[in-house]
Amino acid sequence: MGLPSSLESYLLLILLSFLNVSTIYSSKPSKEEAVLFGGNFPAFYVIGDSLVDPGNNNHLPTMIRANYPPYGSDFEGGKATGRFSNGKTIADYIAIYYKLPLVPAYLGLSDDRKDTISTGMNYASAGCGIRRLTGKIAGKCLSLSKQVDLFEETIEKHLKTNFKTPYELREHLAHSLFMTVIGVNDYAFFYTRLTDANDFADELLHKFLKKIEKLHKLGARKFFINNIKPLGCYPNIVAKTFMLGLRGPSTNRYSSNLLNTTGPCCPLDYDGSLTSSCKRRSKTCKAPDSTHIFFDPRHPTQLANFMYSIACFDERTICHVV
């Protein structure tokens, strides 16, 4: 299934692939590649799940949270912000690359504070997905539909106060970057051996594209879309493709020192059904940012996120522009 015809001529789709690693750099970069690698985005809006949640779930009644040590041990000030990592996420590094502030969790801001921010918002919610019911067994979370609704709320209630005319607001949105990292939890919670793989994928793609279309109607034009990673032998497959994709001179400096490419850095607190995360205030491996790809069984260390950003933007080996 392709993009709705009304979108094809307007969207810049940037795929960060953790599976199909391919080099897109050429001696004559396309206009789209120039936008990606040399762009000057005024704002960065993030929609997604736990890979990029900066703390929205801290403000929701849910079991899926990361607002306690050892999460955040290497973040600024050693604070557990709600990020499912020892430090920064890939969304943080994208913001840094484009010289933007780290994008704040929407639910963690007062209305007055939201009125003052025009450099982006993060609506990502750990455990949630494309389907409305995904992750709800663990409590409340923000589905794809809800996150898009919150972006619409951002425009109507907050962004309009920052721009003198509707034209200025439209230009702001048209030149901003929108990241989506969502879909793997739909498989984790709902996919079984009895599920028809093609039908399930078609359903998710249809729902996803409907929300992309809504974002487009609201003014979004440039998208950074993260591919869904595989389930099953998750750590082994991701680690293998991670090492294959990060073979440039810069990433080799870091990857050559990795001691554990599949195991988590922190002791686990496994509830048997919903999620596996770090035990509260547990001791982690001594140097997660030099030895491990995974901080817990499903989420990368700050080092891994940093290496992804280098491979995407500097070495240009894992990002593909279409």
From Swiss-Prot:
Its EC number is 3.1.1.-. It comes from Arabidopsis thaliana. It comes from the Eukaryota. Residues 1-26 form the signal peptide. It is found in: Secreted. It is an enzyme of class 3 (hydrolase). Its main location: secreted. Keywords: Glycoprotein, Hydrolase, Lipid degradation, Lipid metabolism, Secreted, Signal. The keyword Cell inner membrane does not apply. Belongs to the 'GDSL' lipolytic enzyme family. Coiled coil: none annotated. Pfam families: Lipase_GDSL. This is GDSL esterase/lipase At2g04020. The keyword Isomerase does not apply.
